[in-house]
A protein has these predicted regions:
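S-adenosylmethionine
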Residues: 1-398
């Protein structure tokens, strides 16, 4: 294997990783770790964080190598800049000079130079369950890279937003799919920017924006956002058609509180908010839901496998049983939601999973058990833009 410098930060990062028990998000665990080790400077913390996340992104691959070698492989595949840290770690100039290449090209170079052998199914778990239309290798190796920072510009504030960012010399990019989808620098302080403070933009991943663009709201229709979370899709929906009669629900009041704060910032007051457990057909809250809706958004709980580039530690804790449990929960939720969807109404089923058990398998089960027409289903994959991967199916109730 190639020679690397066993930097002392490797030892700290490995100690941090070995102490993690998967009971909380790694980001929260790492924050506590740094608080317990205040002598680590900001540069060391940044490098340790990068080492840890690189390690998780490698998944279970390369276990035939030592921990130090695995750490170096992971760092090389995921590192995106030439700096003093990378130059101290890698001794081979070919590695240093190629560090800006795409991870797949870097892996090919490691194969050529050192006969490196990594199995894709070890980098990403249960590849046999992944949606067939997803370009698997591209998806897996893109997972070594951080997600880009995307915002959605509200159409009526497009000129003001562009002017503000241009005046402040912000290095932004507009995505070719929409002049309202903008990429900002990863380290940009969005929440203190003029467009955010004035409510001209929303932080929303590109794939989520593209999913929301499939909604087709008509004036005065009744819409239900059943698993509303922080309300990003509802906000996009209201920007498309402000006159809809909107109800948002979720399983906990605390989730809806966050949504309400976000709606308040956007001066949105004309909506209904309810705590409902849609997975429980016998729930009092469920049985009290008597309205019929013209359209329902069911962005259901899932494995989150399309977002694991953000939380790569989850690749090491997922099991097939967990994926199947999500599938059963998703069917239960949507099965109950169909009771409040009027005939001719649209059900928008979505996940941020790449596993077919949670996507087309659930949709096929719904279509086979109900009078539904599947009019559209797709994997939303914008790999070249380093965004999340999502799934969407639109069904009409007959």
């Amino acid at each position: 294997m190639f020679v690397v410098s066993n930097n002392f930060l490797f030892t700290i990062a490995l100690d941090c990783i070995q102490g993690y028990n998967f009971l909380e998000p790694f980001a929260l665990y790492l924050k506590k770790y740094f608080q317990a080790n205040p002598k680590l400077g900001s540069r060391d913390r940044r490098n340790i964080r990068q080492l840890c996340y690189a390690w998780w992104r490698l998944g279970n691959a390369g276990k035939q190598y030592s921990d130090v070698e695995r750490m170096a492989i992971a760092l090389y595949l995921s590192y995106e800049q030439i700096d003093g840290f990378s130059e101290r770690i890698f001794k081979d100039e070919k590695l240093i000079n190629s560090i800006l290449l795409h991870p797949k090209l870097k892996y090919d170079l490691l194969q050529q130079l050192y006969s490196l052998d990594l199995n894709s199914s070890d980098i990403f778990p249960f590849c046999d369950l992944v949606e067939s239309e997803l370009p698997l290798d591209d998806f897996i190796y893109d997972g070594f890279l951080r997600r880009n920072l995307w915002i959605r510009i509200k159409e009526r504030f497009e000129k003001e937003t562009l002017s503000s960012f241009e005046n402040n010399k912000v290095d932004f990019k507009i995505h070719p799919s929409s002049n309202l989808s903008m990429q900002l620098p990863d380290d940009f302080d969005v929440m203190n920017s003029e467009p955010f403070v004035k409510g001209w933009i929303e932080i929303q991943d590109l794939s989520s924006q593209q999913l929301g663009s499939a909604y087709d709201p008509k004036p005065n229709e009744k819409w239900l956002d059943a698993c509303s979370a922080s309300g990003g899709k509802s906000l996009q929906l209201l920007d498309m058609q402000s006159s809809i009669d909107l109800t948002v629900t979720d399983i906990r009041e605390s989730i809806l509180t966050n949504l309400q704060l976000r709606f308040k910032r956007n001066h949105i007051r004309n909506y209904k908010s309810k705590v409902v457990d849609w997975s429980d057909a016998n729930s009092t809250l469920f049985r009290s839901e008597s309205e019929m809706y013209d359209a329902i958004i069911a962005d259901v709980p899932c494995s989150g496998s399309g977002t694991w580039a953000r939380t790569p530690e989850q690749k090491l804790s997922i099991t097939k049983e967990m994926i199947q449990n999500f599938s059963e929960l998703q069917f239960s939720i949507t099965n109950n939601l169909l009771t409040v969807l009027r005939k001719g109404g649209a059900l928008y089923y979505s996940t941020c999973s790449v596993y077919k058990n949670e996507n087309i398998d659930v949709v096929n089960r719904l279509v086979n058990n109900h009078s539904l027409e599947l009019v559209e289903q797709k994997v939303i994959s914008v790999i070249d833009s380093h965004a999340d991967t999502m799934y969407l199916a639109k069904m009409i109730k007959k």
